[in-house]
């Protein structure tokens, strides 16, 4: 189980993440939603420890992730695989080698420097590519692929890390609708087929409601909504994104339903 307790991350006087607390049970597909600048990316990077928190704790299966250093920290980063919007592939290398990069944390230094990959790791990487229908591209340079193909390579790289949790930081932000569906389906397959927990930053409310079994809403660095997609009413979404009804609904303004708590209240958490 992932437990986030009072997590705060400051850059100067600004709190990018401000006293965030929540728990995620194994096997969940959780979406993090909110406006740009709400703290979503910083939250995921702090969980992975790419960013050092100012205060608070991150626990995973009882281990204090915020206290990890050296080899143990590298092992945690392998267990909490990051998927980035920018793909972070090495363009001049072939697809298979890019996927094999996900195995570096398991290799001795001499193997990683020489990129001498064990046959078991090669088989694991090819299997991951097959999962996402891109095995035929294994020998192709990564910079010759489309954006959707590159993101699937990045997801395959995350899968070969054999992680406990995948942290996907706006993985579809630069993709067209067709590739958006392909990438989201790939993440859902990892979640359902392999039982890997997925924590995914998303801008689209429609996608968040369609793919996620739980949503965490952030505003100004704080968690202001935590619940099932069905609980994210249009009234709550308007408050979360500071939008007019027409921006959320795509139609005429409608009155807010009665009995819906304001964001940040106990009932909305």
Swiss-Prot record:
SMART domains: AAA. It catalyses: phosphonate(out) + ATP + H2O = phosphonate(in) + ADP + phosphate + H(+). Its EC number is 7.3.2.2. Pfam families: ABC_tran. It is a peripheral membrane protein. One of its GO terms (cellular component) is plasma membrane. Its main location: membrane. The keyword ATP-binding applies. Residues 2-245 form the ABC transporter domain. It is an enzyme of class 7 (translocase). GO terms for molecular function: ABC-type phosphonate transporter activity; ATP binding; ATP hydrolysis activity. It is found in: Cell inner membrane. ATP binds at residues 34-41. Disulfide bonds: none annotated. Keywords: ATP-binding, Cell inner membrane, Cell membrane, Membrane, Nucleotide-binding, Phosphonate transport, Translocase, Transport. The complex is composed of two ATP-binding proteins (PhnC), two transmembrane proteins (PhnE) and a solute-binding protein (PhnD). Part of the ABC transporter complex PhnCDE involved in phosphonates import. Responsible for energy coupling to the transport system. This is Phosphonates import ATP-binding protein PhnC. It comes from Bradyrhizobium diazoefficiens (strain JCM 10833 / BCRC 13528 / IAM 13628 / NBRC 14792 / USDA 110). The gene is phnC.
């Amino acid at each position: 189980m992932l437990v986030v307790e009072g997590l705060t991350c400051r850059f100067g006087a600004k709190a990018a993440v401000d006293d965030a607390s929540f728990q995620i049970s194994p096997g969940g597909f959780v979406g993090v939603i909110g406006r740009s600048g709400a703290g979503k990316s910083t939250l995921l990077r702090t969980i992975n420890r790419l960013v050092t928190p100012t205060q608070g704790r991150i626990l995973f299966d009882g281990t204090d992730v915020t206290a990890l250093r050296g080899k143990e920290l590298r092992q945690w980063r392998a267990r909490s695989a990051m998927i980035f919007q920018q793909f972070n592939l090495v363009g001049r290398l072939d697809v298979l080698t890019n996927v094999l990069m996900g195995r570096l944390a398991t290799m001795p230094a001499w193997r990683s420097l020489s990129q001498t990959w064990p046959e078991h790791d090669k088989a694991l990487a090819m299997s991951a590519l097959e999962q996402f229908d891109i095995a035929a591209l294994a020998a192709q340079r990564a910079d010759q692929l489309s954006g959707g193909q590159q993101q699937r390579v990045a997801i395959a790289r995350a899968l070969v890390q054999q992680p406990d949790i995948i942290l996907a930081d706006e993985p579809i932000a630069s993709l067209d609708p067709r590739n958006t569906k392909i990438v989201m389906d790939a993440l859902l397959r990892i979640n359902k087929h392999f039982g890997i927990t997925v924590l995914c930053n998303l801008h689209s409310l429609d996608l968040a409601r369609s793919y996620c079994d739980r949503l965490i809403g952030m505003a100004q660095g704080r968690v202001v909504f935590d619940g099932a997609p069905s609980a994210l009413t249009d009234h709550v979404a308007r408050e979360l994104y500071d939008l007019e009804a027409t921006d959320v609904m795509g139609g005429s303004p409608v009155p807010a339903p009665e009995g819906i708590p304001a964001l940040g209240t106990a009932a909305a958490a």
